């Protein structure tokens, strides 16, 4: 491949010169509309193509067009700015533009729109980008440069820092508006100065057939005929690299030979004669760029009896040998390689060396120069140090506070610090924390750096402080409004990030005044404002309610301001110092961004204070997605080269899309619940769909507990976390391309199939370190509610049953009640009124259990004594028992446990006793811990040392008791659960199984027991029917609920057909009515009307064009009405 000469005025740039057009005095560019056209060809990856500058210093107008790492970088700023990055716009276009091919650039600036085109008219890959700018005018009053500049340090926003090396075929700037039109042709205009003046006027052909050494041990042997008998060796080549050091060329045999190598700042030729070394060194210490910045370097060298010579570019060094070369010093073959990089035009003693089949090749690519500058726009985040070889890169994260420890895949993405003092305490319970400063990262992996903030752990919950610098700021009287932005340490963005993730915040404000007014002036003009974090002016002050337009004293009842007719002390305008102070406490509005005062005029004095920002708690920001077609839309996930999204979810369902962004046939990512134990990530970055599936093993993800999900990507990996599981693909973006997403980010939904949506709760959604306000967004979406849980808000669960929120329907958990049915309203009771009533259940085998649960309902029989055993658990060897009975109108739990006997007396939950009405009782014993609930009221747990052990040989459940000691009345819904170590819990329901289900009859013996109802059955509504979302966990499907998605799809199809038919019929009916009405209006009965007037008839849309008009004064014909 070669450079091709296209224009007679082409200019060859050698990397040592540039063109300059001075825009001072009469040549100033003041343009609303202009064009810039540049066409170039090069093999160098970096170099300045065009630059225009203004004299406004670091905040002035400029235009920069440059090659950086083989990509085209375009950067502009119109209008002077108070910040170096304000109004700055930049973009990167194309890749591998240093391919020796011709590339064209066209930039069109038309007022507030600037568009850049790359290779617009060529057959190469095209690209374009547009900016919308705040200002419209380009002002250039210093100079325009092509190919470089005298001093790169004086240029704003230039990344290449290198003179262009290659050919420029066209460089033309055209000012269009305001007129007259002006064209500057940099290659022809006599006002353009060339530095140096000897720069070649035409481009020269250059062979470009590079090869790549892809690893440190890459090499090939270059065979040079006649070299072994030669007295000298001379050679030349060009090379480029990003590796800090390496060997370029060598031939060493014993104590003789030479080696040509490089380091960051040096190229070195070492000649060894009889183990004696002579060094020639070309130093780049004072150059703008280092050797390993990826640019091509031209090297020549010569080794002879009379001299050693080394040249790199225009730098040259010569040495005289101290000893003569031996006769057999050179060999026929020498080795090229020993570094990662590229070579081109390797010539040894006028013979061309290329890697070929006979040259003993090792890891050499022949296809071209295939190295990449990864560090020019550093992929290392948070200030990590980027080092590279041209084939890969690594990030040094030491001292950054991110990605602690050595990790070859790290890009310094994940913070080592907690986000708030609250999370620091919660996630480090073993640490001894005192009131002092700690390293915190308010946006986790976001762009805000780690900062040492003060934590007050004496407060509950702990508070985090971001410091303000604005205390007792004196205000200078002015006729104009006085405004001041509030400064925070480390930044306003950090203060906003803290407030966004906190449950509540407060901030002290104070306005001191002498004659100056704060709130209201004459004619009720508002005088004082503060700007909230969302950019809205607020007119209420510290201590007052949000939106009250008042100060603290104006909020009291009665008004406590100095002048009770005013709302602030300072509005009294007195000639003595007063103040209005207090705390602002709106988390959504804090921190204070700016204050503005109009009431500090001549003859007044004032000062103000905006105190530190204090925040506490962690906002949950929870939303409930009640149907699968409910979702929240956010802006697409960006930037394309790295990002982190994390959230918590809980659901009873085993499917549902949690996150989706992109398009199915293009770049996308999707996080989806796959089944009851697994969640998966699938994505495509342009090289096919890849998947990561993580499983919790025996634990379910649809267990109604919170589970954490995180996805992240960077230039090295795409990763996924589920709770404590993690998977990643080392599928680096830099080997393919960036994650270029279209459309919005969908939370809990999939836009291409709404039936795949997630149903459940999501909280703590964090996108690139920014907490999303799901609670607020839920109010703007359909089928989404703020908070967690929606179905249980109006549930009909009876008898103290727990409502289970399945989010689009609720279920009633009857397991801790002695009732059954969907609403826990049905009884399975038995009568124990007879003196001999008793029911005994014996397990098939005895078991040593650490836990048992008892649930029972009971009602004393009419006129029966308020005593007796209700239920008793016993061991097969009679060594232990546990008994619930009525004694002295109270319940008593007696036991003979592993360490002795004891009892607990249980009072009724309210005034009264257990001798009337229906009562429910639930007890759970786990070793020595006992929990119990009476009539739905949970009592404090008790720890009983005599129970600390196993209930050995549990065998028998006895309900009631034969004889006088038994409970006489109605007992219902007995449920007993036992659990042995290493075994699953086992539940038996003796009354239901024996009397109602006719089950386990061989395990039950009973006397004088029959079915009975202990109390009236409550009225309940119809069973709610949910929309199907898939299989539910832990809950049986109630009768009447459809869960077959195929049936639902068929129903949806039928519904759609019916809707279409109905719409067509309605449309036909409307048309028919219009036709009938038109006919009726045209042919009404006999009557006179002004519509027959000549002027009105001319505008009647229903008059036939051929109908003759009546002459003025002629009696109009009467219309007739026909009855058929």
Swiss-Prot record:
- Localization terms from the record: Membrane
> Found in which tissues?
Component of the acid-insoluble organic matrix of the aragonitic skeleton (at protein level).
InterPro entries on file: ConA-like_dom_sf, EGF-like_dom, EGF-type_Asp/Asn_hydroxyl_site, Laminin_G, Neurexin-like, Neurexin-related_CASP
Q: Which Pfam families match?
A: Laminin_G_2
Q: How does it sit in the membrane?
A: Single-pass membrane protein
Say if the entry is tagged with keyword Transmembrane.
yes
Would the keyword Ribosomal protein be found if you checked this record's keyword annotation? Answer: no
Q: List the disulfide bonds.
A: 167-203, 342-369, 375-386, 380-395, 397-412, 761-788, 792-803, 797-812, 814-824
Residue span of region Disordered:
1011-1047, 1090-1124
What is the official name of this protein in its record? EGF and laminin G domain-containing protein
UniProt organism field: Acropora millepora
